[in-house]
Amino acid sequence: MKNGMGTSSVVSVKARLNRIGCMIVALVLVAGSRVSAAQTRTAQIRTVDTALATLRLDGENGDLIGVHWKSPDLEVIAEPRLGENFRLVLPQPGNEGNYFNSRDQSVSKIEPTPDGVLCTYDSLTNNRETVALKVRYRIRAAGEQLQFSIEVDNPTDRKISEVMYGIIGGQRGIGDRLDTESLIPSWSTNLAPNLFSRFNGGGYGGGNLGIRYDAGTFTYPGAMPMGWMDVYNAKAGLGYYYANQDLETRVMSLEVELHPFSKSASVRDSWPTPAEAGGEPLGITIGWVNFPYVSHGTFTAGPVALQVHGGDWHVASHIYRSWYDQHFAIDRPPDWLRKENAWQSIILSNSEDVVVHRFNELPKLAADAKQYGITTFEILGWDMGGIDRGYPQYRPNPHLGTPEEFKKALADIRALGVHPLIFSNIQFADTATPLFRDKLQQYAVDGRWAPDLSLHGWGEGTISARSGMTRSYMTLVSPAHPEFRQFLMAQYLDLVRDGAEGFQLDKTNDLGWLDFNPRLPVSPDKSLPQGVLETLKELLPAARAINPNFSLASEMWFDRALPYIDVSYMRMGEIDMDSTAFRYTFPEWTATIFGESPGDINPMNNGMRYGFVWDLAPRHYNDSVDEPLTRPLAQYVSELIRIRKEFQDLLFFGRFNDTMGANVQGGPDVRYSVFKSRDPRSTDVASVIVNLGDAPESATLNIDGVSGDVTVAAPDQPDRRATLPVRISVPAHRLAIVVKRASDN
């Protein structure tokens, strides 16, 4: 025994693959082209036994063709013919999609290690060439996980553009395939809930053009705020976690594929039957993809982790958070911004030169907000050019008043006991300005084939601008360039000196790009994510040297940014969060939820349900919260603030527990959530019950394993006592809170 783990044993067995249920059909796909005919062959199977799982490797190419997890018992790979280790792309002139796939190689060595196996490839070959790339591919048991890592030596002057590894091919679900669910979490949605029943590929580029199977790709950071997914069968109480646990911050993608095809317009099941597959291998392949663009050097990536677990995705969430906490520190006392229950956001001027408010009007607007308990005041469109124009010229717009009037307005807002929060950006520049043309264009994010600009724009002040025909455009500019970061930092610190107590940095979630600017000091995959994080890291201590209470909000839900930001800036106008995985994984995290229209009562209810910050932007950021149509909404938010402050240890600073720990029976428009204390010694629990419908509803609440007295709170009503199980009447578009304290017993 070594480190508590048994030494691997490697056994060679000569056998036809019908011993594991099939014949290997070698289908080598290079950029969607078949490069060798389907063939059957006799293969040497190498069995590797680890403490966690028994691995089966193809003895000729080293591919992982079987994973039998020991406890819980699960065969992860059901179709060995889809087993793979890696795919690499080494472009050559006239052939950008020059793939080298592990299934097309002859592995040089398969070596047992104390905790797994190392496959070495001394060179790589395809039907065009043999290249001197050396690959070391490692699979090891570490704790409760199988971990996959890759090392590629590239002595050539050609850059490796893609490395897909940690591939788990041939998956067919857990137990009943149609009962198998999947979670690829975004900030509020599940990007792929039904991989094993309603696979829906083609969500990028040319769809599924260029390949014979169906596939989808999800970028981290980008659509994915966290680097993990989960496959689970709730009925079976079993799942497996699959995650990129590489500490290097760079753009990566999760590739998911269904072989050999999926069916469109299917009622329940988009998978082909075995008969429809016609003997071709059938199953899901997943893998993580890096874009290193490295030559004359060594690229390493990993680990990618696989872990079988009991339960559903909530268990996987804890696995990821446990790993995250070993490397990133976000557990800190909440500062003033994280303690704020509600904001108002207002735009002073837009990109079509419409002046809505001037600097000298801001204190009155902030005073209007405060009378409803709203004490954070976000100011947008204050700078040169108005909202979404003129960036990054972060100086007061002279059409709105003088710099002195701007500073006085911020001082007067602070004197009211309201926090001025200034809207700004990091990685965007208006392409129409002399500043961009003469100075900043050299830092722009460049395309692969030409210095193509990625254009973004949001018009507001005219119909043609709103419809996209005459809007002002901005492009991505990378803060990975130290000179550009310094340019931003000087302006940011001037704003702090002017009296800003914090920033809301907008559009910072736009990170999933490769940047081929030749001036970059980093590789294309690191430009935006590392540049933006470095900006946040530099800004906080520099700003706090001026104002120790300076705080950051940002339109970002990238988990590696959470050490720096206190509130994410987001909207959620849907009835439900399609996935609560990000909120559940990071209970410290919260985000804004907007009320832009006087009728946005249900988003405010959802703010309580999910523990979000209420952000009123009356009449689409134009008016005071005290304007006549918005006044009832503001009064309702004031009541919600009152209730949440009363139980803030649970409802705002506690652990969002999704719907676990309680059960609510009610009509189809009733929703609920559960909050628990983050103090492990506490048994206190709260449930938020929301009626999103147009008619009154009654609901019955039970809290798991708990009986006795509870407190019931509701807007515009005094708190009352009740006994579990409690039946509650909830008016249309209203909510109720039920709180159980240990002291109630």
How would you name each of these model-derived features?
Residues 21-32:
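Bacterial N-terminal signal peptides
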Residues 39-49, 53, 73-120, 135-142, ...:
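Polysaccharide-binding surfaces and accessory modules of carbohydrate-active proteins
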Residues 47-49, 155, 211-336, 359:
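Beta-strand-rich recognition/accessory modules
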Residues 227, 231, 237-241, 250, ...:
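Carbohydrate-binding surface patches
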Residues 340-489, 500-502, 510-523:
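Aromatic-lined carbohydrate-binding/catalytic grooves of carbohydrate-active enzymes
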Residues 435-474, 478-480, 530-631:
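Glycan-recognition surfaces
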Residues 605-683:
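Aromatic- and carboxylate-lined catalytic core of secreted/periplasmic carbohydrate-active enzymes
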Residues 721-745:
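C-terminal beta-strand-rich structural cap/linker in extracellular carbohydrate-active enzymes
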